[in-house]
Curated annotation (Swiss-Prot):
<feature type="binding site">
    <location>
        <position position="169"/>
    </location>
    <ligand>
        <name>Mg(2+)</name>
    </ligand>
</feature>
<feature type="binding site">
    <location>
        <position position="172"/>
    </location>
    <ligand>
        <name>Mg(2+)</name>
    </ligand>
</feature>
<dbReference type="InterPro" id="IPR036389">
    <property type="entry name" value="RNase_III_sf"/>
</dbReference>
<dbReference type="GO" id="GO:0030422">
    <property type="term" value="P:siRNA processing"/>
</dbReference>
<keyword id="KW-0464">Manganese</keyword>
<dbReference type="GO" id="GO:0004525">
    <property type="term" value="F:ribonuclease III activity"/>
</dbReference>
<keyword id="KW-0255">Endonuclease</keyword>
<dbReference type="GO" id="GO:0005634">
    <property type="term" value="C:nucleus"/>
</dbReference>
<comment type="function">
    <text>Cleaves double-stranded RNA (dsRNA).</text>
</comment>
<keyword id="KW-0479">Metal-binding</keyword>
<keyword id="KW-0694">RNA-binding</keyword>
<dbReference type="InterPro" id="IPR014720">
    <property type="entry name" value="dsRBD_dom"/>
</dbReference>
<protein>
    <recommendedName>
        <fullName>Ribonuclease 3-like protein 3</fullName>
        <ecNumber>3.1.26.-</ecNumber>
    </recommendedName>
</protein>
<dbReference type="GO" id="GO:0003723">
    <property type="term" value="F:RNA binding"/>
</dbReference>
<keyword id="KW-0540">Nuclease</keyword>
<dbReference type="InterPro" id="IPR000999">
    <property type="entry name" value="RNase_III_dom"/>
</dbReference>
<feature type="region of interest" description="Disordered">
    <location>
        <begin position="274"/>
        <end position="299"/>
    </location>
</feature>
Length: 299
């Protein structure tokens, strides 16, 4: 994805820009505001025009942006607010859309539409990451890696990808900014988010978590399954044993949970290939109850 024409200059470029404009060195720690063109570009991407333009800048400013000088205003407060209001408006939407659905499936459906991966997808699909103000040295590379991996999972990876948290944060902070600017109007927030997140994950497109699907598959085929993650701290690897035999393995250094999910997916793919099977039936109530007791955090 190419940077849009109004993307903000990097933090390292800003002192030289100041010098060009003012014929003198920028004061230590100087951070120029976003220009009107940048703000307008963000508003265009969001489909919302702010009354208080300063909220746009606040929503896009990462804590690293002021390093090594004293901290300024960052997106953290707006992120907190946006997280809460997104949970509320999406909860309302799935509740009204699926009138007969029980709390368990409703919770999974809501989570799929507001989790870190879904919101990170929103950020990169609309190019919001180009306007992020930060000085985190490895962040741009992490975002690029995430974008390259997205093509493997058109809708959602269900726990197989590890998106940079800042992408999720910036969507939440912008939603929080819209909520504030609209005088706390949840309907406006929903209208904006619905367009940004299109297509929303529906009951028909809601995927299964690889660990839950693995346990369901093994129960149906009368196999014993064990996920071995005790050695992750030493070798960054998680293994899946089926009837005592190692069937799936995955290594991921950053998070044990991702290694666990990828190992479960590898084991599941191998089992299905062995049986010539591509899909499983919907999760039974008995298996669903057992799955709810499984630790999916990788701890």
């Amino acid at each position: 994805m190419e940077s849009p024409p109004h993307a903000t200059a990097s933090a390292d470029e800003m002192p030289s820009i100041w010098k060009e404009q003012h014929a003198q060195d920028a004061p230590p720690g100087f951070v120029p505001p976003m220009g009107p063109g940048e703000v307008a570009a963000v508003e265009s991407l969001l489909g919302y025009e702010f009354r208080d333009k300063a909220l746009v800048e606040e929503a896009l400013t990462h804590g690293s942006f002021y390093y090594p000088y004293r901290p300024g205003v960052t997106y953290e407060r707006l992120e907190y607010l946006g997280d809460a209001v997104l949970t509320c408006v999406v909860s309302r939407e799935v509740f009204l859309t699926y009138g007969q659905l029980q709390p368990g499936p409703l919770t999974r459906l809501r989570a799929a539409n507001v989790d870190k991966e879904k919101l990170a997808r929103v950020a990169v699909v609309h190019g919001l990451h180009h306007f992020l103000r930060h000085k985190a040295p490895n962040l741009d590379g992490q975002i690029t890696d995430f974008i390259e991996e997205l093509s493997m999972y058109p809708i959602h990876s269900n726990g197989l990808l590890d998106p940079p948290k800042v992408l999720c944060d910036v969507v939440e902070s912008l939603i929080g900014a819209i909520y504030c600017d609209s005088n706390f109007n949840q309907e406006i927030v929903w209208q904006v988010f619905q367009k940004l997140a299109d297509p929303l994950i529906s009951l028909e497109t809601l995927g299964k978590h690889p660990v839950s699907e693995l346990f369901e598959f093994c129960q149906k085929t009368r196999r014993g399954v064990k996920i071995v993650k005790d050695e992750w701290d030493k070798n960054l690897t998680v293994e899946v044993l089926i009837d005592g035999e190692m069937v799936g393995r995955a290594t991921y250094a950053q998070k044990k949970e991702i290694a666990q999910n990828r190992a479960a997916k590898a084991a599941l793919d191998k089992l299905k290939e062995t049986l010539g099977q591509s899909q499983t039936e919907p999760m039974s109530a008995e298996v669903s109850e057992q799955f709810n007791k499984i630790d999916l955090t990788g701890s």
